[in-house]
Regions:
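ATP-binding N-terminal substructure of ATP-dependent carboxylate-amine bond-forming enzymes
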Residues: 1-98, 102-108, 115, 127-138
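Acidic/histidine-enriched active-site and ligand-binding environments that engage anionic O-linkages
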Residues: 136-149
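Glycine-rich phosphate-binding loop of ATP-grasp-fold ATP-dependent ligases
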Residues: 20, 121-125, 146-163
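Short glycine/serine/threonine/alanine-rich loop segments
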Residues: 90, 118, 145
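A short, polar/charged loop/turn motif at coil->beta-strand junctions and beta-hairpin connectors
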Residues: 62, 120, 142-143
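Basic phosphate/pyrophosphate-binding loop/patch that engages nucleotide-derived ligands
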Residues: 112-120
Length: 163
């Protein structure tokens, strides 16, 4: 019986590129012997590679049975690569594209949690194009110190500031 071919997606056009490479390398190293590993590297500029050569995603994905998604941040956790895998009919690890997109956006996630009466921290969505100094002063006066500031759609702790 042939072994299941597991494509391990790593790298990608994200600020979390380096950690994705490490995650993917660890998965490739520790994949049980009953599986055949297939390293799928995505460069910072979004070019997919297999066996060290640039390839179209569809050509690569035809050679795997399942994908282990080791991508982090944008493209890997925001529903984009999940949508692509769904379009090609390739099973993969992690949440489906809609859940991934929702989970990556903190404001949308908060609304979804509140719909189900789940407690969430008090917050305010500030957009750089519509928040003047006066608005920011008013916002900061209504919240206790310290303030935790985070981009609405960045992964992990990327962009987090405690002020």
């Amino acid at each position: 019986m042939p072994k299941t071919v597991v494509g391990v997606l790593r790298g990608g056009p994200s600020s979390e590129y380096e950690v994705s490479l490490k995650t993917g390398a660890s998965v490739l190293k520790h994949l049980p012997e009953k599986y055949t590993p297939h390293d799928i590297f995505i460069s910072r500029d979004g070019i997919w590679h297999s066996h060290g050569l640039p390839r179209d995603p569809d050509r690569i994905l035809r050679k795997v049975d399942v994908v282990f998604n080791a991508l982090h941040g944008a493209y890997g956790e925001d529903g984009k690569v999940q949508k692509l895998l769904e379009q090609f009919g390739v099973p993969y690890t992690g949440s489906q594209s809609i859940a991934s997109a929702l989970g990556m956006n903190k404001a949308l996630s908060k609304k979804a949690f509140e719909t189900y009466n789940l407690k969430t921290p008090r917050s305010v969505l500030v957009r750089k194009d519509n928040a003047g100094d006066k608005d920011l002063v008013e916002i900061f006066q209504t919240f206790p110190h310290p303030y935790v500031v985070k981009p609405v759609s960045a992964g992990s702790s990327v962009g987090v500031s405690v002020v």
